[in-house]
Amino acid sequence: ESSAASDVYKRQAWKAARAGLRKSRHTSRTYYQRESKGERNMKFLDAEFVQGFIRMANDGWEQGWHERNGGNLSYRVKPQEAESVKEEFYPGEWRPIGTTVPALGGEYFLVTGSGKYFRNVIIKPEDSICMIELDESGENYRIVWGLVNGGKPTSELPSHLMNHEVKMLATGGAYRVIYHAHTANVIALTFVLPLTDEVFTRELWEMATECPVVFPSGIGVVPWMVPGGRDIAVATSELMKEYDVAIWAHHGMFAAGEDFDLTFGLMHTVEKSAEILVKMLSMRPDKLQTISPQDFRDLARDFKVTLPEKFMYEK
């Protein structure tokens, strides 16, 4: 599919969404279906939270963060959102999560599928994503919608759910999105910077004035670990008690937030800061001038954010 054809399709799709229409693709067929206003049970793909999920997945693909089946996204669904699409559910068998998240018992999540490509989410969502329900113990899940051609949720499901549990408890339920992407500039930096929270936070804060305002608590760093298992999930969830961003060395980045816009914006900001640092290091190994610890304190005062002093060390 050519870039021009792809652009035309996306423009048509979003125009249709704004007009209250739905555009769906099934094999070679494309059709529009108008939904009657005030219909009690919306079709699943028309739900606003599903549209937001699809858009965020496509935004990440367009940034170049999701080669092949790389990366994953999950959203903790609000009770009223789950209720609005319940008529579309077809519950499957219960399966073990691979960890236990008791605080999330009974919750619903929208997640990307294992082995699925982000580039296909916008054109084949029913095959690329799924909604899952957790049992009351938080030990098992079942698919209630999606992955129509078979499959299972992302292989990083234990990491996602353990981090959802941590952020839900830490924020009184405000945080609902967990996002993992293969951000190239952040990954590159994990080969040349010490793998410490202090160094990564300070270096990325210095690259753009907005950074301490967007991620004032800093960034956590997980050393290289085998992905997809409980060990990396535990290590990441420990960092998420303190941070909204965790870098996985030589792998990518994990971000958490209240909604799709804030979480994508957080990932985008950190990766852009990393891009600036990579460019700077390609020009010379040191800086002639930068933002000082006192500058950060002044910024924190005026923008009313709290910046941990552990990142204000003298170089």
Locations of regions flagged by a protein language model:
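N-terminal non-cleavable signal-anchor helices
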Residues: 9, 17-18, 112
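Single conserved hydrophobic/aromatic residue that forms the stacking wall/gate
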Residues: 1-12
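Polybasic, lysine-enriched low-complexity intrinsically disordered terminal tails
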Residues: 18-21, 25, 123
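Acidic, Ala/Val/Gly-enriched low-complexity intrinsically disordered segments
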Residues: 13-19, 35
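Glycine-rich flexible loops
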Residues: 42-315
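Short, Lys/Arg-enriched N-terminal segments with co-localized hydrophobic residues
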Residues: 23-41
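Alpha-helical interaction segments
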Residues: 10, 21-22, 55
